[in-house]
Amino acid sequence: MKALILVGGFGTRLRPLTLSWPKPLVEFCNKAMILHQIEALVKAGVKDIVLAVNYRPEVMVSVLKKTEEEFGINIHFSVETEPLGTAGPLALAREILGKDDSPFFVLNSDVTCVYPFEAFRDFHIAHKCEGSIMVTKVAEPSAYGVVVTKPNSTVIDRFVEKPVEFVGNRINAGIYIFNPSVLDRIELRPTSIEKEIFPAIAADQQLHSFDLQGFWMDVGQPKDFLAGTCLYLSHLTSQHSPLLTDPSQNKWVYGGNVMVDPSAEIDPTAVIGPNVVIGPDAKIGPGVRLQRCVIMSNATVRDHSWIANSIVGWNSTVGRWTRVENITVLGDDVTIKDELYVNGASVLPHKSISTSITEPRIVM
């Protein structure tokens, strides 16, 4: 099988992290976001993966070369000279996606879930229609586009954008399977798969919905990145995953859902958790309190500091007796001096902060 991952452009929603790395290479729970998806696709038998990119493809090529060799797959880079939306990239990659009669996956690179690609593939093959959309249930469907199926059927009847009245609670999860025939519907121009292609396939009664079981989150912006981290860690806990740090062996773990890279240095008087990820070679000092946060590789949190609901970027340093909270995001190589309060700041790379930031703002 084949797959196309919609990588897209500048990743502006996840700045300042994406000022240093393309969004798919930003670590989500200590692994590049795109590697979570590639590994799951390989398990479903995918051999050819197309990455539709229009920002810094050369960085991704060098990083993912090892991934190709490790999994014995072919990773193709389809580079857009202009943004082509969510459907145009399929036309651009027609030569690979349409090279045989087998169906292909399409997925948004921002989505994290359990990735049930094998079950999704089997569902698609069984109904013998042109396309399948993975859907997930949400509590507030009025904020999304809702997928409405025919009664007692998986056949999609229509799509309702941000409904005022309740018509259903299933939304597009950003993961699809198509037969190559769908390529005949798509021109090589900026095109929306959601607004232009899906309604046409649904009108022909050739589009089905597949219910995603378990968690789902679009992690393309900081608050959702943190929420998705919590969901993913909770999933690992439910699976008794060895990727999580064992509280019985590490007394500084509090409340569970903690993932710490083995190379990180944690002072035994620190209190970490719940819902914390600490990356490679990070250093956590005495008396530090971490909760619902991500500390990326080579970052340092000095003595008696408190970090909650925030992301500390690569190579950054948080000084002693400092409080960081409220969706603060520190870019690469940021320094926060001692005894400061940082509230909801987005700090661009290589900045040094020497005064408190009491209200959310961007520090350039």
Swiss-Prot record:
Pathway: Nucleotide-sugar biosynthesis; GDP-alpha-D-mannose biosynthesis; GDP-alpha-D-mannose from alpha-D-mannose 1-phosphate (GTP route): step 1/1
Main location: cytoplasm
UniProt xrefs under InterPro entries: GMPPB_C (IPR056729), GMPPB_N (IPR045233), Hexapep_transf_CS (IPR018357), Mannose-1P_guanyltransferase (IPR050486), NTP_transferase_dom (IPR005835), Nucleotide-diphossugar_trans (IPR029044)
Cellular compartment(s): Cytoplasm
EC number per UniProt: 2.7.7.13
Family that this chain belongs to: Belongs to the transferase hexapeptide repeat family.
Function noted in UniProt: Involved in cell wall synthesis where it is required for glycosylation. Involved in cell cycle progression through cell-size checkpoint.
Name by which UniProt lists this protein: Mannose-1-phosphate guanyltransferase
Organism: Cryptococcus neoformans var. neoformans serotype D (strain JEC21 / ATCC MYA-565) (Filobasidiella neoformans)
